[in-house]
A protein has these predicted regions:
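Extracellular/periplasmic ectodomains of large secreted or surface enzymes and adhesion receptors
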Residues: 301, 305-326
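Alpha-helical segments flanking ligand/cofactor-binding loops in enzyme cores
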Residues: 79, 115, 119, 139-142, ...
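His/Asp/Glu-enriched, well-ordered alpha-helical/loop segment
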Residues: 123-127, 187-190, 198-283, 302
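Histidine/acidic-residue-rich catalytic or RNA/ligand-binding cores of hydrolases
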Residues: 15, 44-48, 99-101, 138-144, ...
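Glycine-enriched alpha-helix->loop->beta-strand junction motifs that scaffold or abut catalytic
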Residues: 143-148, 164-170, 187-190, 213-215, ...
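Short hydrophobic/aromatic-enriched beta-strand-loop microsegments
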Residues: 147-154, 170-172, 296
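Divalent-metal coordination cores built from histidine and acidic residues
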Residues: 1-126, 159-161, 166-186
């Protein structure tokens, strides 16, 4: 699941183009569910001007950039993205760590806007995921019926209990804050302050979520840290009290359930797609084995059998439309 692509000043939805190219067999790649632009409020976390004057962006961003104010504009933004091929809708309903113009715990949607976001997305039979760190915004989003909360750093036990009761998924994304904290002095002062607060809060939040039995899915916010390190999220989950088998389920059966595709993927069962990975070692006893994947099969086709250099694409030295040996 790719939860957003944004190139300031451009309306190109490159994630849709990439997904379509993979699905048509033009290039080799993973099965993708994409969100296109994230939807957010003027001056909020997804506002591409980032708190600067609009001349930096070239113009004032609008609903076609994902920036929408008021229920009607939000519905229009949802329709625009679905029209262009979005599989899932992503919105930012609280401030963020990297956005300079907002506080991380301040709600950015009104209750009416939140209701419009959820209603329109579900009416079009799509799932809605929301970026949310703050507790009050999280509670409003859960009550409105969002399908998942991304991050949830400051969610209190009462709000996590509400998630449990409503069946809302939490995607904790522990790795980004871990990475930011490893180089905290390189960021602007406002980012440092928010990152430190989130780093402290997320550990207690995650432990509470595990204890309460909140449903969780795997996500990393990759891009905040270099791609290719996604599997490190598993160890962070386990280190904070989640059993290894449950951590693995967040990226398999749980994820498929959240996405509404559990009838096709998520578990190895007769009648489902043959999506398989393998690694040396037992990840239930050493979760870091997930960082050493040596075999990848997609729909019964071998994509990798050996270290990364053994990938059919890497061996060929060029992009292929078919896996050798088919």
């Amino acid at each position: 699941r790719d939860l957003g692509s944004r190139f300031p000043g451009s309306k190109e939805m490159v994630d849709i183009a990439l997904r379509n190219a993979i699905n048509k067999g033009y290039i080799v790649g993973p099965r993708m569910l994409v969100a296109t632009f994230g939807i957010g409020a003027t001056g909020g976390h997804f506002d591409p001007t980032g708190g600067y004057r609009d001349m930096i962006f070239g113009r004032e961003p609008d609903w076609s950039d994902g920036i929408a104010d008021g229920p009607d504009a939000i519905r229009k933004a949802v329709r625009f993205e679905v029209k262009n091929g979005a599989d899932v809708i992503k919105a930012a309903v609280s401030g963020g760590v990297f956005s300079l113009a907002d506080e991380v715990d301040v709600p950015q949607f009104t209750p009416a806007e939140m209701a419009a976001l959820v209603d329109e997305t579900h009416r079009l039979r799509k799932k809605v995921a929301v970026h949310c760190h703050g507790d009050s915004a999280g509670k409003e989003a859960i009550e409105a019926g969002v399908d998942s909360i991304e991050h949830g750093s400051f969610l209190k036990p009462e709000t996590l209990t509400l998630m449990k009761n409503k069946g809302t998924y939490l995607t904790p994304t522990l790795m980004p804050v871990e990475y930011i904290m490893s180089k905290i002095d390189s960021y602007p002062a406002p980012v440092q302050a928010k990152a430190r607060a989130a780093a402290t809060a997320r550990e207690e939040m995650f432990r509470n979520a595990v204890k309460l039995g909140v449903k969780m899915s795997f996500g990393t916010d990759a891009g905040v840290f270099p791609h290719g390190q996604n599997a490190k999220e598993f160890k962070l989950m386990v280190d904070l009290g989640m059993p290894a088998i449950d951590a693995l389920k967040t990226a398999t059966g749980n994820a498929a359930d959240l996405f509404g595709i559990a009838q096709k993927v998520g578990t190895l069962e007769k009648g489902k797609l043959a999506d398989v990975i393998a690694m040396p070692g037992d990840p239930t006893s050493d979760i870091t084995a997930t960082e050493r994947v040596s075999f990848v099969m997609k729909e019964g086709k071998i994509i990798r059998n050996g270290p990364p250099s053994a990938s059919p694409v890497a061996e060929a030295g060029e992009t292929l439309t078919e896996i050798p040996g088919d």
